[in-house]
Amino acid sequence: MNIANRLRKIDKTSTVFTISDIKTVLGINDSKSIYNALSYALNTKELYKISNGIYSYDQSYSRKEFGNKYRTPSYISLYTVLQEEGVVFQPYSSISVITNRSEKADIDGQEYIYRKIKDRILLNPLGINEKNGVNIATLERAICDKLYLDGLEYFDNTKNINWDLMIQLNSEVYSNNLNISKFISVYKK
């Protein structure tokens, strides 16, 4: 059975795999053996190489899933979530990711913007959901991230905000950040 079929059999939802994922599925610990297996899989087009150490079945992989696996720990947030949730109306084609190191990367035709945040915030799971192998912020967490990183800002649509969650996030994750507190006091109805 080829690598791609073994990956599909074990993990039916993921579209992006690290070398570590592949080692686990194949039960190979030897570096030379995994290199040979990956080389064969790439030559026979079983797998597609996205970036060093990260692979998919083909070019139709989840860009958000890749964004999470390219830098770990991380979660999708900021304008990616705000646009999808209808809080900002301006279109953004880049994928915004919160992690422990700031960086811009253009990989396989997709721009990724990684923003650094303190570990105590990054590693707190409140307001982060896992959907189809992707760690993604809730609307409220994305707003808090934006306010925490960039200061007060105008958002086009604040109707669907769960204000109780905003208050809880500010208290438990962001240590009562002044910008988040001001935003809540101005916009909470």
Predicted feature locations:
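Short beta-edge/loop segments at beta->alpha junctions of small alpha/beta modules
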Residues: 1-73
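Nucleic-acid-binding surface
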Residues: 56-189
